[in-house]
Every structure is written in structure tokens, then in C-alpha cells.
Amino acid sequence: MKRISFILSLFVMLVACSASLDNADYIPGPNGSGSDGTSETEPDVIADNQIKVISFNVRTSTGDKNTSNAWDLRKKAIPPMFAKENPTVFGVQEARENQMSFLRSQVAGYEGIGVGRDDGKTAGETMGIFYKTSDVELVKWGTFWLSQTPDTPSKGWDAKYYRTATWAVFKHKPSGVTFMYVNTHLDNAGKLARQNGLLLIRDKIIEYNTGNWPVILTADFNSTTDDPIFDSVKGLMTDARTACPVTDKYGSYNGWGQSNSVIDHIFYRGFNGISFHTVRDVYDGVQYMSDHYPVSAVLQVQN
């Protein structure tokens, strides 16, 4: 009966985010950069009935070599950022194996899951999910490809690259609630791939969510949420940026200070949205940890 209710909710749930996210309405950080100064280091604290999630496109380590934006120069800012933000779970996009290894070893208190998109092992970018072991227990997880053959490494429709989604089911220890988390990265070139990839993700959420658990979806969607590709997701989930009573209007893609596009989003179902935040702070003197800012949301478990 729960499963039937979950499927029916696709068609009857009200769309929570009707406002258009026109980039002209969004602003970059001060002088086109992140916040002034170095951030405080005291970890953020949330209530026992809340979950904090972060989505972060880390920018692949194979790009920007021999520049001031090279991975080896900016990676030092990432562990203190996560220590300060203190998320329950977080998803990363574009992470190569060396970046996954860095996060596993340097972000204390978290374990990470995910596979390389090129071979289902370690080759190519990983849509990784990390979880705070003191707060959540991993129940099960998997990866599927955004293509017509989702169970094998493959490229779908008009996509330029292989694209994957990593999903996991967690038990939240403080509240006892089980929830599902999906992290992905839609194609930057193929519009059909973005549309059909998101439809596939919706269908997989229904398939894998056997307990009708609350759901979180994070990604670099390479689209603003007024794009019609989101119509199917808006019938199932809520956009944290527009629904949370505490939010901001900063762009998430900074393009190393040259852009303010709003393409990184957090969607949820079965939670109450508390706050949304674009993380623009400076750590260890690194102005840009990536060409994307991390985005975070605090979600409250429904009674």
C-alpha cells in the first residue's frame, strides 16, 4: 500500500517551486568572489531530527593544470570546509579516483561510496556519496548509468559523456529514520540526455524506494529549475532553494569568478525544508575551492 501511495504522489503532489530561477535574479559573491576573510572553524550543529546535505561539484582534477585553479592548489580548502559545514551526508560530482581518495582520507569522520563512470570501477569521474559514520548507517547502495542500458557502463541519448547516478539508503541514528539519497550529474551538452536522464532517475527512485522512505536528490543538473526537464521531478520532490524559509540568491556555478549560473540543486521529499545555503566562504586562503560553490540544505524529519 505504501508503494502505491508513493507512485500516486507523482501525480497528485503540488509543485512547490513555481518561481523561475532567472540568472539575472542571482548574484555572485562580493566582487565576483567568495566571502571576505577566512571562515570560522566551529562546526555547525543541527537538531537530532534534522539532516544536513551538501552537493558539491569539485571540478575534475584533470582540468586547470599549471594554473592557479589546479586541484593540488585548491584541495587544501575542502577538508576545513566540510569540518565547518558538518553535513550528515554529501554528494560530489566530477571526482576522479585521486579526488575520491583524498576526500576519504582527509575529510575526517566520513566514508565514501561510488564507482567510476567509465568502467564501473575506478576509471573516469565518480558521483560519490559520503556519509558521517557517527550519524548514519549505510543500509545499501548502488550505481546506474543514465542511458538506455542503465546496468552497464554506457552513454545515453545525445550525451557527450558517460553519466551515472549513485544511490544509497541510510538509517539516521539520532532520529531512527531511514532515508534514500541519490547523487548525479546531468550531461552538459545533450538536452535529451538531461531530460531522459532525469526521467530515469525518477523511475529508479520509485523502483529502489521499497520502503517509501524520505528521499534527497542532489546534482549538478546543468540546468536552471525553470527548464521543462524538471517537470517530472517537481511532481515528486521539492526544490530546497525555493521552498526553504531561510535561503539565499547566490549563483552556484562561479566559473572561477566569471559566472553566477544556478545549476546545482537539492531536491527532497518526505522532509520539511529548514534552510538552504550557498557556501561561498574562503578557507586557507583559497578563493575558489572549485568552479562551483557547494550548496547545502538542512532538512527536518517529518513526524
Feature map (PLM): residue ranges:
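Active-site beta-strand/loop signature of hydrolases that rely on acidic residues for catalysis
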Residues: 51-58, 78-103, 130, 168, ...
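Sec-dependent bacterial lipoprotein signal peptides
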Residues: 1-15
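N-terminal, active-site-proximal structural segment of metallo-dependent hydrolase catalytic domains
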Residues: 18-106, 119-125, 199, 302-303
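Short, solvent-exposed loop/turn segments at secondary-structure boundaries
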Residues: 65-69, 155-156, 192-195
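Solvent-exposed loop/turn segments at secondary-structure junctions
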Residues: 58-62, 95-99, 117-121, 135-136, ...
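Structured beta-strand-rich core segments of catalytic domains in phosphoester-bond hydrolases
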Residues: 45, 89, 93-178, 278-279
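Extracellular/periplasmic catalytic domains that process cell-envelope and extracellular macromolecules
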Residues: 45-49, 83-84, 105-106, 120-123, ...
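Metal-dependent phosphoester-hydrolase catalytic domains
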Residues: 29, 37, 192, 196, ...
